[in-house]
Amino acid sequence: MADTITPSELHTLLAAGNVTLLDVRRCADRAAAPQGIPGATWKDPELVESWGDELPREKPVVIYCVRGGSVSSSVQSALRGKNLDVTFVEGGLAAWDASK
């Protein structure tokens, strides 16, 4: 899988049901704006080493943060280090919201 995915591509994956979607926004960002992408499971990006091994390997993993920047990139790197197929949403939650 590529490094990033567009909101449009994510819509397609979600419709097919063939993706594990994770909200990796920092705690403070999530508390300030709790509404995320429907179907996503929140995981604390600061604790990626503790939950990364629990992710299913049979489906690709898509992650998102607020803007698709450093948080997504660092979580992606950590999960790829665990041999997971991981992409993140270009522009993060902001781009997803703008695409609706």
Where in the sequence are the language-model features?
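Rhodanese-like catalytic fold shared by cysteine-dependent sulfurtransferases
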Residues: 1-19, 24-62, 67-100
